[in-house]
Amino acid sequence: PAVIDKDFASAKLAELLDADMLGQIAEIARSVGAYVLCDEVYLPLENTEAFMSMADVYENAIVTNSLSKTYSTPAARVGWVVADEEGSNRIRTYRDYTMICGGVFNDALATYVLEHKDKIVERNRKIVFGNRDIAQAWIDTQHRVSWTAPQGVSTSFIQLDIPEDDEGFCKRLLSERGVL
C-alpha cells in the first residue's frame, strides 16, 4: 500500500498542523487507500490540550514517538508506535527480530520520565521559550537573517540571505571556524 510520510510538528516549518489540515491529509490518504506515517517526536510545548494526533483523525495512521525530544531523554532509546492491529503486529514482529532486549535501565528511566512528564515538559517549555526570545531578539538585529519562529515546538528554520550556496557556506564555516 501507499504511504504518505509526514513529520508533526515539522522541523522545517516549525509549526503544528491543525485539525482541519490533518483532516484534509486523512481524506487524501483515504481516497487512495494510503497509510499516513507520522513522526510526532516534537510534541507541542504549549496548547497541549488542543494537540491532535494523526491517529485521532485517521484509521490508517501509523504514529511514532519517543522520549528523545519533548522529554529530553534520548539516552533512554525508548519510543512507541500507534497503529491498527495489523500494523502494530508487523512492527512488533520486526522489532522483536532486530532487537534482543530494550534494557532494564532504559525501561526504568522511561518509567521515571513518564511519571514526571509534566515537570519535565514545564522545565523544557521555559528553556525553549526563553531561547526563542533570545533568538528573536538577535534575528531582529540581523538584516540577512530571517526565520520561521517555532510555534509551540522546539525547532525552527533559520534562513540566511547570503551570496553563497549552502554547501559552500557550510564548508567555509567548517574550514575557517571549525564548526558546522
Regions found by a protein language model. Give the residues of each.
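Active-site pre-lysine segment of PLP-dependent enzymes
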Residues: E15-V36, E40-T73
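Conserved core segment of the aminotransferase class I/II
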Residues: I62-F129, Q136-W138
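N-terminal low-complexity segments that are often proline-rich with Ser/Thr-Pro
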Residues: P1-L16
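Conserved C-terminal alpha-helix-loop-beta "cap" of PLP-dependent enzymes
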Residues: S146, Q159-L180
